[in-house]
Amino acid sequence: FSREGVTGSFMLSEYLPALKGTYGDTTVYVMEGRTDGPSMLVLGVTHPNEPSGHMAAISLVEHCTVDSGTLYVIPRANNSAFTHNDAQEASPHFYHLQTASGTREFVFGSRATNPLDQWPDPDVYTHQPSGQNLSGSETRNLNRGYPGVANGNMTERACYAITELIKDKEIDITVDLHESSPEYPTINAMVAHESAMELASNALLDMMLDGVQISLEPSPPTLHGLTHRELGDFTDTLPVLMETANPSHGRLRGATNEELVLTGKDPYY
């Protein structure tokens, strides 16, 4: 990703050395503007089976230049989840994009940390520090682990390091990019912490004026572990999660293949 707009990079393990040398570590790209200004963090792939966020993050790294302030981008927020895909879903291992420089190949990963890196799942996952109980498999879901645990499992450690990065760099805005099935109630939507509602409302109006139909949802205060809740509660950042639809996640879909991932078109939807 060496591009003109990138002014530096570092590893997430700088904020938790226990991640170094593991698949929980990942690269953070930095794009500094010509003048001082606010800072923003983009989490590209919390769930690597949701490729639009990955492509958005890569596009920022490869093509974005910053005039004022600093942009931080993590294209592979859950790096371990790129090393496998979800069992019994018949998902493709890769998808390909045709570009002016030739064909580019990208990994279609999993929603969760690889069990080779974190096993076994408990029967019940207890989120820290809220004490909320969730299904045991959610222990490998990066978006159920915030604000993280320094001596926790790999997923909790990655969440902890991202939270510490936000605190250290005094990140003003954090955007977490996602996809979901068309039947999921929160799609084509932004979910914002109460501290970020004014920001998200202004963004929504701008997007609708540009012809993008999107809704705004408040972050549930009692649903814990998610970026839009915990990063707003435990740091000073303004967190917003963005969710778009793709039938490749849907329960009603037909063949799960590369064409479906890329086009988002399925005859059953």
Name what the model sees in each region:
Residues 1-30, 63, 150, 154-269:
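C-terminal accessory segments enriched in acidic
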Residues 51-52, 67-204:
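Active-site/substrate-binding loop(s) of hydrolase catalytic cores
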Residues 39-45, 141, 145:
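Short glycine-rich or small-residue beta-strand-to-loop segments that form or flank ligand, phosphate
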Residues 33, 44-48:
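Glycine-rich His-Gly loop
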Residues 47-55:
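Di-metal (Zn2+ and/or Mg2+/Mn2+) metal-binding site signature of metallo-dependent hydrolases
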Residues 56-69:
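A short, Lys/Arg-enriched amphipathic alpha-helix followed by its capping loop at the start of a domain
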Residues 42-44, 74-76, 176, 215-217:
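Active-site neighborhood of phospho(di)ester-bond hydrolases with catalytic His/Asp-centered motifs
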Residues 33-39:
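Proline/glycine-enriched tight loop/beta-turn segments at coil->beta junctions
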